[in-house]
Amino acid sequence: QTYTFWEHMYKLSAHKTHEEANFLMETRWVLYMEDADTLHLFRVAPRAWFADGERIDLEGVRSYFGRIDARVRSHVGEGYIEATVTCDPERKPSLLAVRLPHPQGKKPVRVTGGRYDETTEWVLIDDFNGEASIRLEY
């Protein structure tokens, strides 16, 4: 099995299109995933993506809840990680769950913008209104 993509279109392919589609869906699920009335962001994103100076930008991605914009900025060298999330207020999820892990596994001393679950590293926002600003301080 090879999990690679052709650079050009051919009439025949040794690659299976469902495998290629699954690769794209799995990449999407790293960044965002819907589960009933919950939107999960960065559910399995690697800790290295949250190293000092790193950033994650999702602009206009499509979901069951409509268009999503999400932005993460890591300033762990200065002691914090920030995230903002917006989505269509008419189609918003009931619960927004944003995972913002510290690259070295530290737990925040202060969280604004939601309630923090130390076990899962989720910031949970109940009754999400379509906009969120989150800050974790270490």
Report residues per predicted region.
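Non-catalytic C-terminal accessory modules of carbohydrate-active enzymes
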Residues: 1-138
